[in-house]
Amino acid sequence: ALTDDLELDFAAVKSFLERHQGQRILLFGFTFMIWQHFYRALCQLEERLDLSNAVLIHGGGWKKLVSEAVSPDEFHRRLEEVCGLHDIHDYYGMVEQTGCVYMECPCGHLHASTYSDVITRRPTDFSVCDFGEPGIVQVVSMLPESYPGHSLLTEDEGVILGEDDCPCGRKGKYFKIRGRLPQAEIRGCSDTYAAKF
């Protein structure tokens, strides 16, 4: 959908949508790139696309591009305005724990999978937080076998909201990420992007 210069290739996108009209389409990308290079480009072109039959999975947050950040509700609302996209899901994950993502449910909560767990820890002594108590996020996965990525203490703050009782009906722990810890080094996909462009 983007050129090598990260410009929206509107003609290519429109052609793709015409070829796959009536079919379910999966869109995947980094949150900030979808916002900057897809949503904003459509607004500047004053064009609309029909993505009402698509699902968007996005992640990576805003990190260094905080000045561009919008709330999840606004992100959803604006994308629906320009392209009818309403099936939008965020995820939480990191390259250090490849293969393990925590998907957002229709209620806006992130969920641990069958193969993963999430724990929040108190910053003062690293003891486990109670449900509803913010803490440092630890992610656990049984997937990594070739490197020690099975248990990672992140630099993110989150809160576990509950277990087996999410209104969406999914079982397991569900949680929210509140942001980076104070004084945490900002790094990730948006850093690579910001450094390059």
Functional labels for PLM-detected ranges:
Residues 1-197:
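Active-site glycine/GP-rich loop and adjacent strand/helix microenvironment
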